[in-house]
A protein has these predicted regions:
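Beta1-alpha1 glycine-rich phosphate/pyrophosphate-binding loop at the start
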Residues: 3-33, 62-74, 83-85, 112-121, ...
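Immediate flanking context of iron-sulfur cluster ligation sites
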Residues: 34-54, 78-103
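A structured beta-alpha segment of the ubiquitous adenosine-cofactor-binding alpha/beta core
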Residues: 36, 209-230, 276-284, 347-393
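Extended, hydrophobic alpha-helical segments in both membrane/secreted and soluble proteins
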Residues: 55, 59, 157-162, 292-294, ...
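FAD-binding core/adjacent interface of flavoenzyme oxidoreductases
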Residues: 68, 93-96, 101-153, 169, ...
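FAD-site-proximal beta/loop scaffold in flavoenzymes
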Residues: 254-289, 373-447
Length: 477
């Protein structure tokens, strides 16, 4: 055991400093500053090097966290990075946006003993940024190019991870995306104050330099059928994610200035990338000077709230039907939102949208927590005669996402889906009801975390490789 480790008794937990609230509210830059070199080494040395590393157990990617913490504590940064990236295609992304408090850090043994968790995410970000700065992150070098090609539909975390893994094996990889930029949720869904866009674009450029081809503004079902795409490639992966907004069907739902979360966030991100966004420029999808109400309690709701603050909203309120302890969003993000001036109105649910042509107010019911539902969470129940009214010029619905009707969009009735609309894929092989067509990420498991998308993409690459290798053996035989 290195003498540099197990310092958690002597060294307290310390996170990277946040930028001043008054400063960070004025822009979309990331709010967390990076560790200084000595601080990263010091915080890494707090790891207790557990015999059973629960941080690794609770990471979807099973990242070798204790090992790269030890290497960081010893100042062996390049080795730490190489170990980190061996199991994770985007450590610079996960270090920034993973809900570590629910995964690795939340299960850190020294956290359970009252010493404060090792700051795993911040250290992961530190060693990865150091790798980019020092040129340790390099394009993929192919020793032997294979003849087979794979088409990937969707350039989000699952599609990018799968494409990279297949390219490493020598396959020709083409990634198709309906949008004008690659990155999916990473580029248009997550605000810059959590994930600056140059971080995503840097990774995309690296994949292009590795020989992966990106075809943008391409819609399966319009520009090509799934059948035609399947004939063009030796295998296909569907990794479209889930983008259909869940609705709240209430009186007044047809009033103007009520928008789904992704429409609001996409407009903001496009504007930040320098695009001309008419609905933003004319004030429609812009929170400036408005009383904003966001409905929902997940991380997307937090993104909408904090984006509204940065657009200089007059007021920003969040309606959530349960209490703080039962909120699905990251506790860290809730705290950041409160620091920036967001008002959370717990145990409330919208009853009616009111206004003449456009939204003017939201009628809200007070809620109380009843008996647990099937998920084990206490079910919110309306308190009788408890409704009250909140002024609103802009309402954003952040109630989660469902799959689009892909068989209809892709014009492919053979593509089987579950009763929830997610694609049916074999649990082991990830192959769909169509031979040679695989699926991964949120379109299979439902809306989830970026880290799970990366995990699914890596697994899909293994399955596709096995499929193509078995086809090759049959041809040889």
């Amino acid at each position: 055991m290195s003498e540099k480790m197990l310092k958690f008794v002597d060294i307290g937990q310390q996170n990277p400093p946040k930028r001043d609230i008054s400063e960070r509210k004025e822009d979309f830059d990331e709010i967390y500053q990076e560790f200084l070199k000595d601080r990263a080494v010091q915080q890494s040395s707090r790891c207790s090097q557990c015999g059973v590393p629960f941080c690794q157990v609770h990471c979807p990617l099973s990242n070798n966290i204790p090992d790269w913490l030890k290497l960081t504590a010893e100042g062996r940064y390049e080795e730490a990075y190489q170990l980190s990236q061996s199991t994770n295609n985007m450590p610079e992304v996960c270090g920034r946006i993973c809900p570590q408090d629910r995964l690795c850090e939340g299960n850190c043994v020294i956290e359970q003993s009252g010493h404060g968790t090792v700051t795993i995410g911040s250290i992961e970000k530190y060693i990865t940024e150091k790798a980019w700065e020092n040129g340790w992150v390099k394009p993929i070098e192919i020793n032997s190019e294979k003849n087979e090609s794979v088409g990937i539909i969707g350039s989000g975390p699952a599609g990018l991870a799968c494409g990279e893994q297949l390219r490493k094996k020598g396959y020709k990889v083409t990634i198709y995306d309906r949008y004008d930029r690659a990155g999916g949720l990473l580029i248009y869904g997550i605000p810059g104050f959590k994930l600056e866009k140059h971080v995503v674009q840097r990774r995309i450029k690296l994949l292009e330099e590795s020989g992966i081809k990106f075809v943008l503004n391409f819609e399966v079902g319009k520009d090509s059928s799934l059948t035609e795409l399947r004939e063009k490639h030796d295998a296909i992966l569907i990794a479209t994610g889930v983008y259909k907004a869940r609705e709240v069907n209430l009186p007044g739902n047809d009033l103007s200035n009520i928008f789904p979360a992704m429409e609001f966030l996409t407009a903001s991100n496009k504007k930040g990338l320098g695009d001309k966004v008419e609905l933003f420029d004319n004030g429609t999808l812009n929170a400036e000077g408005k009383d904003v109400v966001v409905i929902g309690g997940g991380d997307t709701a937090m993104d909408c709230l904090r984006t509204s603050v940065r657009q200089n909203a007059k007021s920003v309120k969040c309606l959530y039907r349960r209490d703080r302890e039962n909120m699905p969003g990251s506790a860290r993000e809730v705290g950041n939102a409160e620091e920036e001036g967001v008002e959370f109105i717990w145990l409330t649910s919208p009853k009616e949208f009111k206004g003449t042509n456009k939204i003017e107010s939201v009628v809200v019911n007070k809620m109380k927590l009843g008996e647990p539902d099937d998920s084990g969470r206490r079910k919110p129940v309306i308190e009788e005669n408890s409704d009250f009214e909140i002024k609103a010029d802009l309402v954003i619905k952040a109630l989660g996402f469902d799959p689009e009707d892909l068989p209809k969009l892709f014009n492919e009735e053979k593509l089987q889906v579950s009763r929830w609309g997610t694609i049916k894929a074999d649990f082991d092989t990830m192959e769909t009801s169509i031979e040679g067509v695989f699926a991964a990420g949120d379109i299979v498991r439902g809306a989830s975390l970026v880290v799970w998308g990366i995990k699914d993409g890596r697994d899909a690459a293994t399955s596709i490789d096995n499929y193509l290798q078995s086809k090759q053996k049959l041809r040889v035989a």
